[in-house]
UniProtKB/Swiss-Prot annotation:
Segments traversing the membrane: none
Keyword Ribonucleoprotein: no
Name by which UniProt lists this protein: Phosphoglycerate kinase
Keywords, ordered alphabetically: ATP-binding, Cytoplasm, Glycolysis, Kinase, Nucleotide-binding, Transferase
GO molecular function: ADP binding; ATP binding; phosphoglycerate kinase activity
Residues holding ATP: 209, 297, 328, 355-358
SUPFAM superfamilies: Phosphoglycerate kinase
The protein's annotated pathway: Carbohydrate degradation; glycolysis; pyruvate from D-glyceraldehyde 3-phosphate: step 2/5
Species in which this protein is naturally found: Streptococcus gordonii (strain Challis / ATCC 35105 / BCRC 15272 / CH1 / DL1 / V288)
Length: 399
């Protein structure tokens, strides 16, 4: 990566601005998944060990009007971070700018941390954070000593005041360890993979993955398709899909992708079908590709699991984004489990999960520790897989 990183700058005695991704699920004031906080610790600890004074920025959820602030304060995150760091984390509830915040920042000593309140509280008055208001970016940049560390891969595909805005107004904008690793794993996998390189794409909609499929058909040796989008590809070929999910307006796109794929695109050969999505009374495997009338496909079937297992044999690089079925339901998780197990058993494989539901599946189904890398950013990793330039990354200082 030809951008400066946190190791390229002198941090001692400096007020260092850091964009982290603490957008974690909070229920009744309790954090239900702290993975993103844990992922930011190496960068924060490094800054503190180097004698820097860390000023952290993050958003939490969507805030459009005053009422949305309820339950969106970063207060629980400040408490959780303090426990993880084993030291006090300064935090002023409800405050994203002003004299009180400036005084607290100026009072920081080397090795101390302050977390600014949810950056999206600034969205209440004209979406200043989300629309990258130039004055807000300039103001936040003025709170530090000319160094900005972006470690929020999860928002790197967005141009916000707290990442791109600050970057434009500091002497040096550098990557943190998490951002550096995310780019190294995902971009390298796509641009310079050890081959055979197999991509696996699941999820419900073809429309979400068109750009990714197109890019990966050029870069990968094989692209395996599963999940709900299977049925749009089926229908495009005239295969019966019963009541399965389909995007009627994407049938032409699916047909064009199949033609362009030249045999690289591998579809399931059977499904696990049910007679309803939720209150079903019958679940069975289809004979072949066709889904029975009155049924809908909710997972790939056993023949598909075997076919995908075979397609993955010998793979050296695997990128997986999107589950094979409705994995949250035990009746429809065999496909996702089967594919995960097929990936991780390959000797010497570099296995990467592109965030989102696939990451949740690996964690919930106990396979997370077997993968080389699990991305913290669903949308950002998708855009990297699509070959797009991420604004948050582009805004960093060149080496």
């Amino acid at each position: 990566m030809a951008k400066l990183t946190v190791k390229d700058v002198d941090l001692k005695g400096k007020k260092v601005l850091v964009r982290v991704d603490f957008n974690v699920p909070v229920k009744d004031g309790v954090i239900t998944n702290d993975n993103r906080i844990t992922a930011a610790l190496p960068t924060i600890k490094y800054i503190l060990e180097q004698g820097g004074r860390a000023i952290l920025f993050s958003h939490l959820g969507r805030v459009k009007e005053e009422a949305d602030k309820e339950g969106k304060s970063l207060a629980p995150v400040a408490a959780d971070l303090a426990a993880k760091l084993g030291q006090d984390v300064k935090f002023i509830p409800g405050v994203t700018r002003g004299a009180e915040l400036e005084a607290a920042i100026n009072a920081l000593e080397d090795g101390q941390v302050l977390l600014v309140e949810n950056t999206r509280f600034e969205d209440v008055d004209g979406k200043k954070e989300s629309k990258n208001d130039p004055e807000l970016g300039k103001y936040w940049a003025s709170l530090g000593d000319g160094i900005f560390v972006n470690d929020a891969f999860g928002t790197a595909h967005r141009a916000h005041a707290s990442n791109v805005g600050i970057s434009a107004n500091v002497e040096k904008a550098v990557a943190g360890f998490l951002l550096e690793n995310e780019i190294a794993y995902i971009q390298e996998a796509v641009e310079a993979p050890e081959r055979p390189f197999v991509a696996i794409l699941g999820g419900s909609k073809v429309s979400d993955k068109i750009g990714v499929i197109e890019n990966l058909l050029e870069k990968a040796d094989k692209v395996l398709i599963g999940g709900g989008m299977t049925y749009t590809f089926y229908k495009a070929q005239g295969i019966e899909i019963g009541n399965s999910l389909v995007e009627e307006d994407k049938l032409d796109v699916a047909k064009a992708l199949l033609e362009k794929a030249n045999g690289k695109l591998i579809l399931p050969v059977d499904s696990k079908e049910a007679n309803a999505f939720a209150d079903y009374t019958e679940v069975k495997d289809t004979e072949g590709e066709a889904v029975d009338p009155g049924f809908l496909g909710l997972d790939i079937g056993p023949k598909s699991i075997a076919k995908f297992d075979e397609a993955l044999t010998g793979a050296k690089t695997v990128v997986w984004n999107g589950p094979m079925g409705v994995f949250e339901n035990p009746d429809f998780q065999a496909g996702t489990i089967g594919v995960m197990d097929a990936i991780v058993k390959q000797p010497g494989v570099k296995s990467i999960i592109g965030g989102g539901d696939s990451a949740a599946a690996a964690i919930n189904l106990g396979r997370a520790d077997k993968f080389s890398w699990i991305s913290t950013g669903g949308g950002a990793s998708m855009e990297l897989l699509e070959g797009k330039v991420l604004p948050g990354l582009a805004a960093l200082t060149e080496k």
